[in-house]
C-alpha cells in the first residue's frame, strides 16, 4: 500500500511539473458511432463455424454484487441495463447462448438466468473496502466451475463486443482449455506497486511472474487443469481476498498450472487504444469509449 502511494505521488508530481502526461495523446479518429440502439443481428456465413457453434453449449456468466452499480474504470453506467453494454453486444453474436448472473439481490433481466446468492462467501471480511469487488471476482471463478456448458465465459458488464472475431475466443478455449486476458501491468511487482487492493507476492518468483486481467475469462468443460486453477482461485480469494490478478498469480504458483493468455485485443483498456485488430473494448474506461466513438 505504501509503495502504491509513493508511486502515485511521483506520477502526480511529474504530471504537475509538466514532465509527464496522464496518458499518451491519441490521433484523431473517424470511427462510426456505435451504440446499443444501432446493433443489428449478425449471422456468420462460415459453415464450419456454424457447425461448431451449433454443436457446442456456451454460457456467459456475469457477477453483480451490490444494488448500486459502481464502475471502477470511471464510466457512469447507472442509466444502462445492469448487464449492458456486454449483454446486448454478446447477444448480437451469440443469440443462442445461455446467460447467467450471480447476484446478492433480485436482478431480473429478460433472457438471463439469475442465481441469487443468499449467503455469499467472505461474510467475515465485509469491512474490507473492496468487499463487493472480491465477491464479484469470486463468483466469476465459481460460476465457470458450476457451469454445465461446454464453454463457459465470465465477463464484466462494461464491455463492448466490436466484431465477429469474438468467435475466436471459443476456438481458443476449445484448444487450450482455459484463457485469461493479457494485462498492461507487466510483472507482478509492477502490479503490486501501482495498483489498489494488492497483497505481497512472497513466493520464490520474487514478483517476476506475469500479471493478467479478469475479463473475459474462459473455461472448457474438458479442461481439468482449468478447473484446478479456478478452484485454487476461489480458495485463495476466500482465505486472503485481494485484487483478482494477485489471487490468480498465487493460484497459478500453488497449482503449477497457468492459463492461455489472450492478447490485449480481447480486452482493450485505457492506454491500449488504437492497437489495431480490436475485438472487445473495455468501455468502462471512458477514454476507450471516446476513442472508438461508443456512445453509452
Model-derived features: positions:
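N-terminal anchoring/stem segment of glycosyltransferases
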Residues: 5-126, 282-296
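A conserved donor-nucleotide-binding helix/loop in the catalytic core
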Residues: 82-85, 122-155, 163-167, 212, ...
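A structural signal for short coil/turn segments at secondary-structure junctions
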Residues: 93-94, 147-148, 173-174, 255-256
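A structural signal for short, well-ordered beta-strand segments and their strand-loop junctions
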Residues: 100-103, 153-156, 161, 178-181, ...
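Short, charged, surface-exposed secondary-structure boundary motifs
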Residues: 123-131, 187-193, 291-292
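Conserved donor-nucleotide/metal-binding helix-loop-beta segment in metal-dependent transferases, i.e.
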Residues: 163-195
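Short, flexible, basic/aromatic active-site loop/helix in glycosyltransferases
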Residues: 195-208
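Catalytic core and acceptor-binding pocket of nucleotide-sugar-dependent glycosyltransferases
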Residues: 207-293
Amino acid at each position: 500500500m505504501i509503495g502504491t502511494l509513493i508511486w502515485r505521488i511521483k506520477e502526480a508530481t511529474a504530471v504537475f511539473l509538466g514532465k509527464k502526461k496522464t496518458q499518451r495523446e491519441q490521433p484523431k479518429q473517424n470511427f462510426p458511432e456505435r451504440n446499443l440502439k444501432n446493433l443489428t443481428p449478425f449471422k456468420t456465413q462460415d459453415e464450419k463455424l456454424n457447425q461448431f457453434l451449433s454443436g457446442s453449449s456456451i454460457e456467459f456468466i456475469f457477477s453483480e454484487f451490490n444494488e448500486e452499480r459502481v464502475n471502477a474504470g470511471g464510466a457512469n453506467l447507472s442509466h444502462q441495463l445492469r448487464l449492458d453494454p456486454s449483454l446486448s453486444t454478446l447477444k448480437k453474436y451469440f443469440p443462442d447462448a445461455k446467460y447467467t448472473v450471480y447476484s446478492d439481490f433480485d436482478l431480473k433481466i429478460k433472457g438471463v438466468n439469475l442465481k441469487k446468492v443468499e449467503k455469499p462467501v467472505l461474510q467475515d471480511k465485509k469491512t474490507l473496502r473492496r468487499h463487493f469487488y472480491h465477491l464479484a471476482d469470486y463468483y466469476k471463478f465459481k460460476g465457470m466451475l458450476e457451469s454445465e456448458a461446454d464453454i463457459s465465459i465470465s465477463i464484466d458488464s462494461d464491455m463492448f463486443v466490436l466484431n465477429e472475431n469474438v468467435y475466436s475466443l471459443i476456438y481458443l478455449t476449445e484448444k487450450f482449455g482455459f484463457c485469461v486476458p493479457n494485462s498492461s501491468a507487466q510483472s507482478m511487482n509492477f502490479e503490486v506497486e501501482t495498483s489498489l487492493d494488492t497483497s505481497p507476492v512472497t513466493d520464490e518468483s520474487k514478483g517476476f511472474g506475469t500479471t493478467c486481467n479478469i475479463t473475459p475469462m474462459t473455461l472448457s468443460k474438458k479442461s481439468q487443469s482449468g478447473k484446478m486453477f479456478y478452484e485454487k482461485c476461489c480458495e485463495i480469494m476466500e482465505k486472503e481476498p485481494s485484487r483478482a490478478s494477485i489471487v490468480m498469480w498465487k493460484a497459478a504458483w500453488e497449482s503449477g498450472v497457468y492459463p492461455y493468455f489472450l492478447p490485449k485485443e480481447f480486452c482493450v483498456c485505457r492506454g491500449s487504444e488504437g492497437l489495431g485488430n480490436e475485438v472487445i473494448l473495455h468501455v468502462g474506461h471512458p477514454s476507450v469509449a471516446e476513442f472508438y466513438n461508443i456512445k453509452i
